Amino acid sequence: MSKGTPSMGKRNKGSYHIRCRRCGRRAYHVRKKRCAACGFPNKRMRKYSWQNKKVNGKRIK
């Protein structure tokens, strides 16, 4: 297989992410065995303050 742009078209044969058991989103990475959305199989849920927009529309820098 060659490097570069021609080999990028061969990447869409399978799927990297399947449905997560905990959150139900299609974000569980099969090879990494980790959900990109909720962090499963970690015990703590993955959540950050920057995921949600502020209610009053102002972002704090």
Curated annotation (Swiss-Prot):
Give me the comment on cofactor binding: Binds 1 zinc ion per subunit.
Q: Which InterPro entries match?
A: Ribosomal_eL37, Ribosomal_eL37/eL43, Ribosomal_eL37_CS, Ribosomal_zn-bd
Listed GO biological process terms:
translation
Record-listed Zn(2+) binding positions: C20, C23, C35, C38
Q: Carries keyword Hydrolase?
A: no
Provide the GO MF annotations for this entry: RNA binding; rRNA binding; structural constituent of ribosome; zinc ion binding
Tell me which residue ranges form C4-type zinc fingers: 20-38
Example of a GO cellular component annotation carried by this entry: cytosolic large ribosomal subunit
Cofactor(s) needed, names only, are: Zn(2+)
Ordered alphabetically, the record's keywords are:
Metal-binding, Ribonucleoprotein, Ribosomal protein, RNA-binding, rRNA-binding, Zinc, Zinc-finger
**From the record, what ranges are coiled-coil?**
none
Q: Which family does it belong to?
A: Belongs to the eukaryotic ribosomal protein eL37 family.
Entry's PANTHER family? Answer: 60S RIBOSOMAL PROTEIN L37, RIBOSOMAL PROTEIN L37
Say what the protein does. Binds to the 23S rRNA.
Q: Under what name is this protein listed? A: Large ribosomal subunit protein eL37
